[in-house]
Amino acid sequence: MDIQTVLSDLKLNGKVIPVVGGDVNQTYRIKTEHRAYFLKIHPNVKKGFFEAEVDGLKELSAFVRVPDTYMLGETSEGAYLLMEWIEPGKGDQRDLAAALANLHQQTAPQFGFRKDNYLGTLVQKNSFEEDWWTFFFKDRLESQISLAEETNRWNVQRQEKYLRFKERVLKSVEPKKITPRLLHGDLWSGNVFFDQQGHPVFVDPAVSYGNREQDIAMSQLFGGFRPEFLDAYQTIFPLEKGWKDRLPIYQLYYLLAHLNMFGESYGSQVDQLLENF
């Protein structure tokens, strides 16, 4: 997708600097005479792709620091989103833990969200449900499995493993009330940073109201968070007994999504988790 077409559409003139680090969008820092912007471009999608991101950022913005969003649109080649450029700085992982704990203190009557959104490039289903495990299996795991079936990344053997996994999960979890809490939804280390004042900044969410253990599970899946982050979170807002044992349940969701986005290179991790839980 041609960036000059997008800049013309935005009526922006400035120095264009590619920004590396993400797997989903083309990203740029646009330095104009008066300020800097962050521009995200994604080919072959409609602007609804970025409308979902803006909606998620607005949901988070009352409770944690997120970038402001200025304009989104689409061309014949794809869609774009113009955002605030926040200069990265250094910060304390304990402050990040406090910000996440504050986010997780926000609750809702039901699990889900008011509309579907995206995890990476994949549609994230968000129907409202009263029961957490009904929501999680249907709108998280099984929606990803359906996508994997469509691309021949799911077979009879994996389905059999999954059904046994599901049975073990439902037998192992205690029938206690789980409170729907506001989740970032894609909490890997690339989606949080610190600004120049040391404040945590949250980006690229896949927002819903769910079990907060899901955010913790993602934070521990691919690394990048120092031990003091989790220690501080536990001090501020302790997790329920047995939370460590349940993390693989939620990590399966993200591994399935990676299987769908990036292919069979994640298949062995999916298989191992299904077999070992």
Swiss-Prot record:
Q: What does this protein do?
A: Ketoamine kinase that phosphorylates ketoamines, such as erythruloselysine, erythrulosecadaverine, ribuloselysine and ribulosecadaverine, on the third carbon of the sugar moiety to generate ketoamine 3-phosphate. Has higher activity on free lysine (erythruloselysine and ribuloselysine), than on ribuloselysine and erythruloselysine residues on glycated proteins.
- Protein residues bound to ATP: E84, W85, I86
Show the active-site residues: D186
Alphabetized Pfam families for the sequence: Fructosamin_kin (PF03881)
Upper lineage:
Bacteria, Bacillati, Bacillota, Bacilli, Lactobacillales
Q: Which reaction does it catalyse?
A: N(6)-(D-ribulosyl)-L-lysine + ATP = N(6)-(3-O-phospho-D-ribulosyl)-L-lysine + ADP + H(+); N-(D-ribulosyl)-cadaverine + ATP = N-(3-O-phospho-D-ribulosyl)-cadaverine + ADP + H(+); N(6)-(D-erythrulosyl)-L-lysine + ATP = N(6)-(3-O-phospho-D-erythrulosyl)-L-lysine + ADP + H(+); N-(D-erythrulosyl)-cadaverine + ATP = N-(3-O-phospho-D-erythrulosyl)-cadaverine + ADP + H(+)
One GO MF term, please?
ATP binding
Reading the lineage from the top rank, the first entry is Bacteria
Which keywords appear in this protein's UniProt record, sorted alphabetically?
A: ATP-binding, Kinase, Nucleotide-binding, Transferase
Q: What is this protein called?
A: Probable ketoamine kinase HMPREF0351_12196
Q: Where is the signal peptide?
A: none
What EC identifiers does the entry list? 2.7.1.-
Q: Which family does it belong to?
A: Belongs to the fructosamine kinase family.
Q: Whose protein is this, by species? A: Enterococcus faecium (strain ATCC BAA-472 / TX0016 / DO)
